[in-house]
Amino acid sequence: MGGELAAVRCDLEDFAAEVFEPFARADQRRWGEVYLRGLLLDGRRKSVEPMAARLGEDGNRQALAHFITSSPWDAAHVRSRLAWRMQQVIKPTTLIIDDTGFLKDGDASACVSRQYTGTAGKVTNCQAGVSLHLASDGASAVIDWRLFLTESWDPASPKADPVKTARRGPCGIPAEVGHVEKWQLALDMIDETRSWGIDVPLAVADGGYGDTAAFRLGLEERGLDYVVGISTTTTAQTEGARPHIPPYGGRGPRPQPAYPEPAQRVKQLVIAAGRQAARPVQWREGSRPGSGRSGAKRMYSRFVALRIRPAGREIRKNTDGPELPVRWLLAEWPATEAEPVQFWLSNLPADTPLATLVRTAKLRWRIEHDYREMKQALGPAHFEGRTWRGWHHHVTLVSVAHAFCTLQRITRSPKGTASA
């Protein structure tokens, strides 16, 4: 944003003053704005040393490093201000949840482990951050983060690694922080945003979250509708299936109601419905040239929607009565494919149109858009400090910088949106 930054300097100062209002001291507000400008300026690396050089703050490099790494400001307070600001503009219809990897060469940074990340497409040495985004059709913003702590970093876990647990002190990891599954971190972030007064009624996530029944149940307990990805191995009964009570033989405990047929994999249920059940749906127009109404490429495929009863021990344990609850199964089955290629579960109402199911499921593209923008220009993985606090400070300010870019696009757009 190099040359453009001077033109919007006043806007940036006003935005920084609003978002950094929770800072207790004037010097924190000053360094917050300086760091924000460093992230927004053109440059290959967005770590302290090169940013200080580009900003002409070489003599204050240590002060900038202290601000981001160890200064005692609460990142959650900044994120809450950011969330309020962006909610007014985005008018979110959906919360989107995902995680991204921060690749690392060494093992000294907080929570670095060998783990799978989609960033690299393999198991590698990295940190993993779970993020929560406000989204509408026209814009989105990341408003909350959690750094995932693997079991190897948790001294209370049987999988604890003594070398890693010894690093907790130097990394400043709070004693009360232990291993928490990513899906639970996502629910915790939803609870936190609600405590800020932000309540969005619909959640979207990929199969890394949707495959976990406890996550789906957690969304339902919070009164949230959802459309979440699932794997082909997820099992379910058909909507018409009914449990029955086997005859009692007169000895032992009475038998409990059970479904006469075993649950089937969702892929088999869709294949059984047949290709003729697939309907064409266009969910949006992309940014590349094409045949859409605006001259852009149409995002289009064929989809099957079935009413089914998701199965599994966790679902049964949390169901009142003998019948499993009915949910939507959505599957994408392109005309060029022999089998369906992607699957989602949803608790949206039974009369929800197919187009609404598809548009909601596909809204997850916004989180990929946010990640791509941040990684290309704002350096979320460029933080070279090793502390727990510093990581949360850095990704929070990257989110602030990304939100400022989004606001500038909305301001300049004739339609008042930031669509990409």
Regions inferred by a protein language model and the residue ranges of each:
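Hydrophobic, well-ordered secondary-structure elements that form the walls
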Residues: 368, 400
